[in-house]
Each structure stands twice: as structure tokens, then as C-alpha cells.
Amino acid sequence: MLKTPLCDLLGIEKPVFQGGMAWIADASLASAVSEAGGLGIIAAMNADANWLRDQIHELRAKTDKPFGVNVMLMSPFADEVAQVVIDERVPVVVTGAGNPAKYMKAWNEAGIKVIPVVASVALARLVARRGATAVVAEGAESGGHIGETSTMALVPQVVDAVDIPVVAAGGIADGRGVAAAFMLGAEGVQMGTRFLVADECTVSEQYKEMVLKANDTSTRATGRSTGHPVRALKSPFTNAYAKSEGSGASAEELGAMGTGALRKAAKDGNYEEGSFLCGQIAGMVNERQSAREIVDDLVDGAEHVLKGACAWVA
């Protein structure tokens, strides 16, 4: 049985987080992952308080297991969403796209476990000082908004820099990746891309088919000129965006291009105009499975690898 101290800290059975993917990580997927023993996460994205409250209620109708909410700090509704997670007694809050320091005192006082996603040692240290329960160290292999440091390089540096549990994210798709993360000092993993093709994931069929057909070179990162790089599957949209970026388009022009592109991919399956966020491990995702099958495969695979590695030690 694969269990780390982080499992006891959060009350979960398996050290697997499902990434809080905007327009994708809803009550359907999150409840299934939590029921499977991992930590399912609802993405609050740019939604308002009422939408999030409805999603929390829907999830609780499906499971009584621990779950989390991903709060995107750049959202215009961040303040009201930050209050909803308190009012609804959400067990875990995962934050992204910014520094959560302004909310952490209130969340901690409410008994919420706060786990920021970080892409640097500096931010990891800052949130640890402010009372974070753990951090997700997310490497540049991830889909969506990314930093510049790989998971292999980032995770051990964050582990050495803070005295709280570290969850590894980016480039993890099977038990080998989970085992590698543990060897780097992580106590858990967060994964998004493989869950895109879970049976309970409500993303568009076009999106799922693109992930299943992807290989090791199917993603590209754009938006570095804006300071907010994003990794997605190559598509007409990413080609057009990269062309505009290379031609010197302003941050405002690029922002206008990107507005609504993820929704067009996730909900409409719009190949021409959608941004299909996806990690570099998409080439390893080649079958549809239930969330439970995915979680079990990760854990069973990691156990097999970790036990086998001991045979190399004389």
C-alpha cells in the first residue's frame, strides 16, 4: 500500500491530486477522483461565487471524501470565491496564478488546508512562511500556465527549501513518474493531462481525441513575451498566437486573442479557435479509463517500481 504522511494530513487514501484545470475540473471529475481515494479538485477559474457553490454542492451529493477547490488568483471573482470556500467549509484550497498571501490568514483560521502551486523556490518559501500546509511544485512540462524550470530540477530544490510537504506536478503520467517524484523528495503528485481522458471528465470529444493522438512533440509553449507562458497542444490557434507573438503583438492584443480560447476547446471542441491545454506527457496517454482506474494504475505502478528498485541496492 502506497501511503505518505501527506495522506494522513489531508485524510486521503492515495497521494494523488487531480489538477485544477479550468473549464475541465468540475464536480463530475473531482468527485470521481476523491471517491477513488485521491484528492479531487474543482477549478473555480473565472467563475463567480454562485457557480462554485453549486459545484461544491453537486460534488458533496456524490461523495463524502475530502476534496479541494483551485482558486485562480487572477480571477475577477477571487475575493468572493475566497469567501465561498470558507462558507462552504472546503477542506483544501489549491491556489494558482499568483501569490495567495492576502487570503491565507483567513483560510488558516477557518481550518482550511492551503496548498499553493509554485513554479519557483522563492514563492515556495514565501507561502511556507505565510502558513501553507504544503506546496505543489509544478514544472514546465505541465499543461496550462507554466514556469521555466523542469519538474526534475524544481522539486528537489523546493523540498530542500521548505519544511512542509511538497507535491510534484508536471510530466507525470504513470507509476514511474510517481516513483521518481518520491525519490526527489515529494510526498504526493498532481496530474492533469491523463485525467483529460477519464470517463468522468466532461471535456469535449475533440479535446479527448487530440490528447489520445498526441506524441512527445505535440505541445508548444506560447505567451512568454507576456510573462504568462502557457503550454497547449499544437493547433491552428497556437500557430496563430505564436505568429502574432513573433510579429511583436502587444500583451493586450495577445490577451484578446486568448480570451475564451480554453472554453472553446473544452466545451465546444472548436479545433480552429480553441486552446487545448495539455502537458508534455500527452504521448503517454493512450486509453480512456475511469478516474478510479487511473488512480489505481498510478499507485500500483509506483509500488511496483519502488519495490523493484530495491533489488539494485547491494
Task: Give a label for each model feature.
Residues M1-P165:
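Active-site entrance/lid segments in N-terminal catalytic domains of soluble metabolic enzymes
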